[in-house]
């Protein structure tokens, strides 16, 4: 995974690593950005190399968009990264488990090197990037079901735009990827994968992200309110890295709250977000 702790994919990957370790499995986590002193977590590359891979990918996207910053981080093209197959941790591994590997962690060529190693690969998808050309969420676009081109996230889309060129590279990459097992973290994501041209021939399993029962557990509601100094209201909890990101769905949450108020399910003064 690109990061050890930052972001939902990183948290999910690290929880899995810790659970496997507790169960007695020898597991290592390769990351671009290490954020702890754990000996199980191994950083890839030097600091200057990491900056170069990150900047080079963004530079290519920026120039293809004629120097517009719009959607600069909405897409990823995996044109640069690190060859992890030479690392001792990789060579010693029986199974390779990929998570979120964008922003300079692995290039498409690096992923091909992993496939060509002959080791069985599990890839957990935390968004749609693997089954589209360059976007992490297709929104209403359905071109990933046929062939990505005329990309809505590019300033000047066309039949042979950046999205189409990356799509063709991915198509070639995944056509020779065996054995590859895909994991989706939700049934919705699984349905998108099974409709995509790139991955619909691959086996897909749904394994939702889990929560630690030690950190998250049921408690008496009134006691919890008292201990946490929570107001005596209907509390709705919403969390996201950025609530201004449309794919996080905050607008749907607000619509739902309005409906609850309009239908008098909850009085407005008794709601706490």
Predicted regions and their residues:
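A conserved catalytic-core segment of Leloir-type glycosyltransferases
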Residues: 22-95
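Short N-terminal targeting/anchoring amphipathic segment
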Residues: 85-106, 119-126
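Alpha-helical "lid/cap" subdomains adjacent to substrate-binding clefts that gate access
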Residues: 48-72, 125, 129-169
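Conserved donor-binding/catalytic core segment of Leloir-type glycosyltransferases
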Residues: 229-248, 254-258
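A conserved, positively charged/aromatic
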Residues: 90, 113-116, 136-140, 171-178, ...
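A short helix->loop->beta-strand "cap" motif at the edges of active sites that frequently abuts
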Residues: 116-121, 178-180, 201-202, 269-271
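Donor nucleotide-sugar binding/catalytic pocket of nucleotide-sugar-dependent glycosyltransferases
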Residues: 130, 143-221, 225-231, 235
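N-terminal subdomain of nucleotide-sugar transferases
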Residues: 1-45, 91, 116-118, 255-260, ...
